[in-house]
């Protein structure tokens, strides 16, 4: 346990205590993440969500899952990429995938989705730590859109409805 002494505004002193606890957690994804099918657990959960949600999935250089962060209530129009990169750096990730749900039930990329994709594409060009943007997946009821597979840059997925290119 670490203790740190602080002074209060009125000159009073107090002792702040905190403890670091290590726990074992089973990762929701095992092995490599190379296409949307590898993220099935996340995709399935997002299909029935009624609240907008963005999930950042963080990977190492070998496409192995390191962790994820859920941003509740976020949409493509409101998402702050700076917060996303905070977690990216904390996990020492090298690659990332963005999962976003469309509660409307339509997995077609919106204008705001396209803007967010372009923002991430611009970010990876200028950031000094050179993150690799692996995919942007939009999940809707019974369908999803994958930027990578619709661009031809990743493995083919049989669950695709749209072939929009960016």
Place the predicted regions along the sequence by residue:
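Active-site-proximal loop/helix of nucleotide/amide-processing enzymes and allied scaffolds
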Residues: 1-17, 26-29, 41, 73-166
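Alpha-helix N-cap recognition
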Residues: 31-37
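Short, basic/aromatic recognition patches
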Residues: 38-46
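Short, flexible loop/turn motifs enriched in small residues
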Residues: 48-53
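Short beta-strand scaffold segments in enzyme catalytic cores
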Residues: 54-58, 63, 135-138
């Amino acid at each position: 346990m670490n203790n740190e002494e602080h002074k209060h505004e009125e000159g009073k002193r107090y002792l702040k205590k905190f403890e670091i606890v290590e726990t074992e957690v089973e990762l929701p994804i095992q092995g490599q993440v190379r296409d949307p099918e590898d993220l099935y657990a996340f995709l399935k959960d997002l299909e029935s969500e009624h609240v907008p949600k963005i999930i950042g999935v963080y990977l190492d250089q070998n496409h192995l899952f390191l962790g994820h962060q859920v941003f509740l209530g976020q949409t493509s129009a409101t998402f702050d990429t700076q917060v996303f990169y905070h977690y990216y750096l904390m996990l020492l990730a090298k690659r990332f995938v963005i999962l976003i749900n469309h509660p409307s039930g339509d997995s077609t990329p919106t204008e705001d989705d396209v803007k967010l994709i372009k923002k991430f594409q611009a970010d990876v060009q200028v950031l000094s730590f050179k993150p690799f943007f692996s995919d942007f997946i939009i999940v809707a009821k019974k369908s999803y859109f994958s930027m990578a597979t619709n661009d031809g840059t990743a493995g083919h997925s049989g669950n695709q409805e749209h072939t929009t290119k960016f």
